[in-house]
Swiss-Prot record:
<keyword id="KW-0204">Cytolysis</keyword>
<keyword id="KW-0354">Hemolysis</keyword>
<dbReference type="GO" id="GO:0031640">
    <property type="term" value="P:killing of cells of another organism"/>
</dbReference>
<keyword id="KW-0964">Secreted</keyword>
<keyword id="KW-0479">Metal-binding</keyword>
<dbReference type="GO" id="GO:0005576">
    <property type="term" value="C:extracellular region"/>
</dbReference>
<dbReference type="InterPro" id="IPR017946">
    <property type="entry name" value="PLC-like_Pdiesterase_TIM-brl"/>
</dbReference>
<feature type="disulfide bond">
    <location>
        <begin position="47"/>
        <end position="192"/>
    </location>
</feature>
<keyword id="KW-0800">Toxin</keyword>
<protein>
    <recommendedName>
        <fullName>Dermonecrotic toxin LamSicTox-alphaIV1iii</fullName>
        <ecNumber>4.6.1.-</ecNumber>
    </recommendedName>
</protein>
<feature type="binding site">
    <location>
        <position position="85"/>
    </location>
    <ligand>
        <name>Mg(2+)</name>
    </ligand>
</feature>
<feature type="active site" description="Nucleophile">
    <location>
        <position position="41"/>
    </location>
</feature>
<feature type="active site">
    <location>
        <position position="5"/>
    </location>
</feature>
<dbReference type="GO" id="GO:0090729">
    <property type="term" value="F:toxin activity"/>
</dbReference>
<comment type="similarity">
    <text>Belongs to the arthropod phospholipase D family. Class II subfamily.</text>
</comment>
<keyword id="KW-0442">Lipid degradation</keyword>
<feature type="disulfide bond">
    <location>
        <begin position="45"/>
        <end position="51"/>
    </location>
</feature>
Length: 275
């Protein structure tokens, strides 16, 4: 999965897919009532990027729905996965549940079209703070109570704060998520800085073990050719990047073209892949 980083305006969906992304990451900010408000990152946001692109969440979700609904004039077949990077910093442990409930209701209305012919992309809820695990509980409960529990088949989970893996596993369990139940594990840092692959290797080892909790592992945010090669050699499932074309180029190199391929809609992002 080539994951386009910080896609916060609707026009950027086409921009990143045209560069080779089959997945995008979108930042979501919340108002004082725990309601998702904008697709917006703000500063700091990484090197060589403009941090202030934004849409109202409702508008972005409708644009995203069109881009992932077969038959729509804006449909992009390649776009199969969306990571919502949830900026929950202004939420408390007590309001996180409400935030998750309200966000699920928003997705149901504006992205899934009330459960009728909505967008088809898989969704990952990515939360930076393991103390906000109740966001996941609220999200799941809202879909169940609305009679759309079936949509949880399209939803995965990630804690992105580079916490201890056992602590993440515990937070997932508190949220009601079982081991390997659509769990993506991220590791990374802003593209301005270097980061070792130590925790990536630990997560990959967990993913590949008989008693791990991780379904897929992705690394963010990289674009240097050497770093991309190192990440692929570490056997990650996804790479988040500002330059999807760089990842495409590396995948076409002799060392990788027979080892990796781009994921398609037929590839289940929740299934453990073993060579």
């Amino acid at each position: 999965w080539i994951m386009g980083h910080m896609v916060n305006e609707i026009y950027q969906i086409d921009e990143f897919v045209d560069l080779g992304a089959n997945s995008i990451e979108t930042d979501i900010t919340f108002d004082d009532d725990a309601m998702a408000e904008y697709s917006y990152h703000g500063v700091p946001c990484g090197c060589m990027r403009w941090c202030h692109k934004w849409e109202y969440v409702n508008d972005f979700l409708e644009g995203l729905r069109r881009a992932t609904t077969p038959g729509d004039s804006k449909y992009r077949k390649q776009l199969i996965l969306v990571v919502f990077d949830l900026k929950t910093g202004d939420l408390s442990s007590s309001t996180a549940y409400k935030g998750g409930k309200l966000f699920a209701e928003k997705l149901l209305r504006y992205y899934w079209n009330g459960g009728s012919n909505g967008g088809r992309a898989y969704i990952i809820i990515s939360i930076p703070d393991i103390d906000h695990y109740a966001f996941i509980s609220g999200f799941r409960d809202a879909l169940k109570k609305s009679g759309h529990e079936d949509l949880l088949a399209k939803v995965g989970y990630d804690f992105s704060g580079n916490d201890d893996l056992n602590s993440i596993r515990s937070a997932l369990h508190k949220a009601g998520v079982k081991d390997r139940e659509h769990v993506w594990q991220s590791d990374g840092i802003t593209n301005c800085l270097l980061r070792s692959l130590d925790r990536v290797n630990e997560a990959v080892k967990n993913r590949d073990s008989s008693n791990g909790y991780i379904s897929k592992m992705y690394y963010w945010t990289i674009e240097k050719y050497a770093t991309v090669r190192d990440a692929l050699n570490a056997e990650v499932d996804g790479i988040m990047t500002n330059y999807p074309d760089v990842i495409v180029n590396v995948l076409n190199e002799d060392s990788f073209k027979n080892r990796f391929r781009m994921a398609t809609f037929d590839d289940n992002p929740w299934e453990l892949f073993k060579r």
